Amino acid sequence: MLLILLSVALLAFSSAQDLDEDVSQEDVPLVISDGGDSEQFIDEERQGPPLGGQQSQPSAGDGNQNDGPQQGPPQQGGQQQQGPPPPQGKPQGPPQQGGHPPPPQGRPQGPPQQGGHPRPPRGRPQGPPQQGGHQQGPPPPPPGKPQGPPPQGGRPQGPPQGQSPQ
């Protein structure tokens, strides 16, 4: 069971990462929206290459030396954008992992029920009371039944009825 769960978890996690990477490329503006400055630089990159990629790169490098090289090649920018998604993927991972622990929690609950720990205690208490009840219950009815008919006059009625058919 554990192997199956682990394999399923790995498959789900890997597929989630693949989806995150695909989504990260599509959601580039959303990821970049975290920083207003980065949006402006990216806009410059987008506008710059069509006008003249060489001119836009030096200007971007002059504006921000750190961001300049990263902005120059759009591929590197893509890697940076992919960087934030992995953190997003990580938070998504724990929820999935968190989902797996509940099933184990359900399993421990199951074994006690299957183990019958609750059942034997239930059966044991029920056993003695039932036995005691049977012992106490049956004795009163038998004495009550024989005692009941005689006072009613069943004896006098019985003999005449028995004699008449004979």
Swiss-Prot record:
Changing S24A: Decreased phosphorylation by FAM20C. Residues 1-16 form the signal peptide. Changing Q163K: In allele PRH2-3. GO terms for cellular component: extracellular space. Changing I42L: In allele PRH1-PA and allele PRH1-DB. Its main location: secreted. This is Salivary acidic proline-rich phosphoprotein 1/2. Residues 48-61, 68-82 have a biased composition (Low complexity). The gene is PRH1. The modification Phosphoserine is found at S24, S33, S38. Residues 17-46 are annotated as: Inhibits hydroxyapatite formation, binds to hydroxyapatite and calcium. PRP's act as highly potent inhibitors of crystal growth of calcium phosphates. They provide a protective and reparative environment for dental enamel which is important for the integrity of the teeth. Keywords: Cleavage on pair of basic residues, Glycoprotein, Phosphoprotein, Pyrrolidone carboxylic acid, Repeat, Secreted, Signal. Residues 16-166 are annotated as: Disordered. It holds the Pfam family Pro-rich.
